[in-house]
Amino acid sequence: GVLDIFKDAAKQILAHAAEQI
């Protein structure tokens, strides 16, 4: 569902943020 897509996007954003730290 839409929430699943949002969750996947959030996970990717957090993953990229973690790499920058």
UniProtKB/Swiss-Prot annotation:
Pfam families xref list: Antimicrobial15
InterPro entries recorded: Antimicrobial15 (IPR012518)
Keyword Secreted carried by entry: yes
Gene Ontology BP terms: defense response to bacterium; symbiont-mediated hemolysis of host erythrocyte
Compartments in which it is found: Secreted
Cysteines engaged in disulfide bonds, as pairs: none
Modification Isoleucine amide, positions: 21
Source taxon at top rank: Eukaryota
Tissue: Expressed by the skin dorsal glands.
Keywords assigned by UniProt, alphabetized: Amidation, Amphibian defense peptide, Antibiotic, Antimicrobial, Cytolysis, Hemolysis, Secreted
One cellular component (GO) term of this entry: extracellular region
UniProt keyword annotation of Secreted present: yes
Function of the molecule: Has hemolytic activity against human erythrocytes and antibacterial activity against the Gram-negative bacterium E.coli.
Family the entry assigns: Belongs to the frog skin active peptide (FSAP) family. Ocellatin subfamily.
Protein known as: Ocellatin-2
